Curated annotation (Swiss-Prot):
Binding, Zn(2+): H65, H157, H161
UniProt function note: Possible metal-dependent hydrolase.
Major subcellular site: cytoplasm
Pfam families (UniProt xref): DinB_2 (PF12867)
Protein known as: Putative metal-dependent hydrolase BPUM_0784
Organism: Bacillus pumilus (strain SAFR-032)
NCBIfam families reported in the protein's UniProt record: PRK13291.1
Subcellular location, record wording: Cytoplasm
Subunit description: Homodimer.
Alphabetized UniProt keyword annotations: Cytoplasm, Hydrolase, Metal-binding, Zinc
Note describing how the cofactor binds: Binds 1 zinc ion per subunit.
Enzyme superclass (EC): hydrolase
C-alpha cells in the first residue's frame, strides 16, 4: 500500500540548500506539464476514471487536483513575496476532488497546468536568493515554509502524482 500511495517516497526538505538544486527544481517545474500531457494523452475515459490504488483518486481526479494544488501554491508564493510570513488558507483537497469539475475532461486542466507553470517558472526565475528565504505559515501543518522548501515540495508533489499515473499504466499494461 505504501509503495502505491507514495511511489517516490515521502517528501523531506533538503538539508543543503544550493542554487544548483533550486535551478534543477525550477527546470523540473517547467517540464512537468508536458510530462502529464504525454503520459495521459492516449488514455481512454475508462482509464482516466480508474483509481491509482484502492481508495485513491482516479487519474482524472489527480490531474484536476494538480491544477487546484498548484494554483494554490502559486498564490502562496505571491503572498509570501508581498507580505511578511502570511498565514495561508488550507483547503479541503479531498472535498475539492469530489466537486463536479473534477469529473470534467482533463483537457480543461492540462492547458491550465501548462499556463500556470509557465507563469510560476517565470516568477521563480525572476526571484533572488533572498526571495527564496521568504516564507508562509501553514496553520494546518503548524509550519513556517520557506519558498526554497516550498519549491522542492511542489516538485515532489508533481513527481509524486505523475508516478501514481505512470505506475498505474505499468501495472495495468496500458502502454
Amino acid at each position: 500500500m505504501t509503495s502505491l500511495q507514495y511511489p517516490i517516497g515521502l517528501y523531506g526538505p533538503v538539508e543543503n540548500k544550493t542554487k544548483e538544486q533550486l535551478e534543477a527544481w525550477i527546470d523540473q517545474l517547467a517540464e512537468i506539464p508536458q510530462q502529464y500531457e504525454a503520459v495521459t494523452n492516449q488514455l481512454t475515459d475508462a482509464q482516466l476514471d480508474t483509481p491509482y490504488r484502492t481508495g485513491g483518486w482516479t487519474v482524472r481526479q489527480l490531474i484536476h487536483h494538480v491544477a487546484d494544488s498548484h494554483l494554490n501554491a502559486y498564490l502562496r508564493f505571491k503572498l509570501a513575496l508581498t507580505e511578511e510570513t502570511p498565514h495561508i488558507r488550507p483547503y479541503d483537497q479531498a472535498g475539492f476532488a469530489e466537486l463536479p469539475d473534477s469529473k470534467a475532461p482533463i483537457s480543461l486542466s492540462l492547458p491550465f497546468i501548462s499556463s500556470l507553470h509557465r507563469r510560476w517558472v517565470t516568477l521563480l526565475r525572476g526571484m533572488t536568493a533572498e526571495d527564496f528565504t521568504a516564507s508562509y505559515y501553514h496553520p494546518a501543518d503548524q509550519q513556517t515554509v520557506s519558498l526554497y522548501d516550498a519549491t522542492g515540495m511542489y516538485v515532489w508533489h508533481s513527481t509524486h502524482h505523475l508516478a501514481h499515473i505512470t505506475e498505474l499504466i505499468k501495472r495495468n499494461q496500458w502502454n
